[in-house]
Design a protein with these regions (language model features):
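Short, solvent-exposed beta-strand/turn "edge" segments of beta-rich domains on protein surfaces
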Residues: 30-34
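Sec-dependent signal peptide recognition
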Residues: 12-22
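Structured domain cores in non-transmembrane regions
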Residues: 51-162
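A eukaryote-biased signal for long
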Residues: 131-247
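Alpha-helical and His/Cys-centered functional microenvironments
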Residues: 8, 19, 210
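N-terminal secretory signal peptides that target proteins for export/translocation
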Residues: 1-12
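C-terminal motif of bacterial Sec signal peptides marking the signal peptidase cleavage site
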Residues: 26-27
């Protein structure tokens, strides 16, 4: 409803009460968070990691068509660093109360300076009306800290330009109790496993010096049996083993 419509109706119906007019005007108000109705999401990120959190809000049945997304970001840094987001638990859209439904997580990592040497994995904080003891982070009192371990999985790049990596972060999520969420601090920290492994099983074979790539079986991706080893390119060099290139 536009302001022109409101005031046109006001002149047609002079008997409108001020309280009713205020209600109509509130129906056209801008989206706003509700006071101190927030929780804190904070934690630690490794060097060369970034984090984006997208809070998704939805309305009740009478406002089922309404929704809102709020985005929070922590950029890359060369050293380990912390982040802290103040996330509203609810928003008001006119006469509709929009409640936090979930927080989508995008965990970014980079392993080089080139544009293609950046990737991400996903996580999620799901807000539920009633959580169970199995959820772990929803018991009475302060929620337990959440720890996610990220691993780098390597492979030959599709264009044979070098080694490309895929980021895999385990445990980047939880179920949060809506009633216990207000004014709480949820701690979600990330670490990196120093051990890298191949993205696909049985495509590289591990030796004490590192990983050696092997030729695949015909029509398959896995190594031949017995394995036949090959070279690969990385940083404009012909390499036989990863990560040191040469034995």
């Amino acid at each position: 409803m536009t302001s022109h419509t409101i005031f046109r109706n006001r002149y047609r119906h002079a008997h409108l009460r001020p309280a009713m007019l205020g209600l109509l005007l509130s129906g056209c108000s801008t989206l706003a968070s509700v006071g101190a109705d927030t929780f804190t999401l904070e934690g630690e990120l490794p060097a060369d990691f970034a984090l984006k959190a997208q809070a998704h809000y939805g309305g009740a049945e009478s406002c089922s068509g309404r929704g809102h997304v709020e985005t929070f970001k922590e950029d890359y840094e060369k050293a380990p660093h912390g982040y802290r987001f103040e996330v509203p638990v609810s928003y008001r859209d006119g006469i509709c109360d929009l409640q936090l439904v979930r927080v989508g997580l995008f965990i970014y990592g980079r392993y080089g300076e080139k544009d293609w040497q950046e990737t991400y994995d996903n996580g999620e904080l799901l807000v539920v009306a009633k959580a169970t003891a199995e959820d772990g982070n929803n018991l009475h009192g302060h929620p337990a800290p959440i720890h996610s371990e990220c691993s780098w999985l390597f492979q030959e790049s599709k264009l044979n330009l070098g080694i490309s990596k895929i980021l895999s972060c385990k445990g980047a999520g939880a179920r949060l109790n809506r009633k216990q969420l207000r004014l709480q601090t949820i701690i979600l920290s990330f670490t990196v496993n120093p051990r890298e492994e191949p993205y696909r099983d049985n495509t590289w074979i591990e030796f004490p010096e590192g990983w050696r790539p092997c030729l695949p079986k015909e029509g398959w991706q896995q190594c031949q049996d017995p394995p036949v080893f090959k070279t690969y390119k990385n940083n404009n060099k012909e390499c036989t083993i990863y990560p040191n290139c040469t034995e």
